[in-house]
Regions:
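Residues that define the transmembrane beta-barrel architecture of outer-membrane proteins
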Residues: 25-27, 44-48, 79-85, 114-118, ...
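Repeated loop/turn-to-beta-strand initiation elements of outer-membrane beta-barrel proteins
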Residues: 27, 60-66, 95-100, 128-134, ...
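Outer-membrane beta-barrel "beta-signal"
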Residues: 28-30, 92, 126, 151-166
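Glycine- and aromatic-enriched membrane insertion/assembly motifs of diderm outer-membrane
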Residues: 42-96
Length: 166
């Protein structure tokens, strides 16, 4: 019982100290994995993706991001390797680590597949120290090329670093 109470107090202290992390002028870098068979669309049997993001807080709780990525798609897909470039905005809700993001990605593969994909995500920035986070997120990508075949829902797990610029 004492161990559980102690762990609860440590978790509460971690959440409280995360409140000042999303300030104007900070920069952000992140690497993440997506897919890992924890996503769904109409055609693929397996997919795995790597993504790198960089961002800047325009004001408290509001960040703009640029991302580069690579996706490998299994199954019957004729274009299994896709490169991704995109931009998005992220809003942190009430300084508690929960964020909402919206953006646009461009995916390209083998001169046969080009797709613009509006994307939305909901995630949580769990601080493991003052600047480093583990960031699980649920995302949705809407294909403008073929909704039923290429739109995607999935889970992303990232590691982020919030850097001070002052």
């Amino acid at each position: 019982m004492i161990k559980k109470l102690f762990m609860l107090m440590v978790a509460l202290a971690t959440v409280i100290t995360a409140s000042a992390q999303f300030e104007q002028g900070k920069t952000y870098i992140s690497a993440s994995l997506s897919g890992l068979d924890l996503n769904y669309n109409g055609t693929t049997k397996f997919s795995c993706g790597l993504e790198a993001k960089g961002g800047y807080f325009l004001e408290d709780d509001l960040m703009v991001l640029a991302n580069l990525g690579y996706n490998h798609v299994g199954g019957d897909d004729p274009s299994p390797d896709r490169f991704v470039v995109g931009a998005m905005g992220r809003y942190y809700i009430i300084q508690n680590g929960i964020y909402l993001g919206v953006g646009m990605n461009y995916k390209h593969s083998n001169h046969k597949y080009n797709d613009f994909m509006p994307t939305a995500e909901v995630g949580y920035a769990f601080f493991i120290n003052r600047t480093v986070t583990i960031e699980p997120a649920i995302y949705y990508e809407q294909s403008l090329k073929n909704h039923s075949k290429y739109s995607n829902v999935g889970l992303r797990l990232g590691l982020g670093v919030y850097l001070f610029t002052n």
